[in-house]
Amino acid sequence: MSLNRHQIRESAFKIIFAKSANPDADLSELQDQVLEEFHETEAPDQFLKDLVMGVSLNLEAINETISGELKKGWTVKRLESPDRVILQMGTYEIKYTETPDKVAINEALELAKKYTDEDARKFINGVLSNIAK
């Protein structure tokens, strides 16, 4: 059984989150661990690989884009880890993929519903909406 796009995004979130907590971790091992949670035995979907690698390879530019939307004195590193990863993924999809902006923002908000609180969801929505303009 292959994962749907939302499950793939959630898997990517978990992989990127784990990698941000442990920069020395092996991406392939993280990917295997996350996919085991879904009892997924098939090879990872290309979309998952593209999302994880796209965020990783463009992280500096993504963080600069996010920083431009933060209040003066705030940095991306100051954000809570789940919020930061969701913003990084949403920004990547808005800026670097063909995903419609509304879909990228909605998917980010779905992740935020599960992994953050109401204030963080509003914050993520505002930042990504500004980035999409």
Curated annotation (Swiss-Prot):
Q: Which SUPFAM superfamilies match?
A: NusB-like
What keywords sit in the KW lines? RNA-binding, Transcription, Transcription antitermination, Transcription regulation
Keyword RNA-binding on this protein?
Answer: yes
Provide a GO CC annotation, any one.
cytosol
Q: Which GO terms describe its biological process?
A: DNA-templated transcription termination; transcription antitermination
Known Gene3D superfamilies for this protein?
NusB-like (1.10.940.10)
The keyword Transcription is assigned to this record: yes
Question: Which cysteine pairs are covalently linked by disulfides here?
Answer: none
> Molecular function (GO) terms listed?
RNA binding
Say which family it is in: Belongs to the NusB family.
Protein task:
Involved in transcription antitermination. Required for transcription of ribosomal RNA (rRNA) genes. Binds specifically to the boxA antiterminator sequence of the ribosomal RNA (rrn) operons.
In its UniProt entry, what is this protein called? Transcription antitermination protein NusB
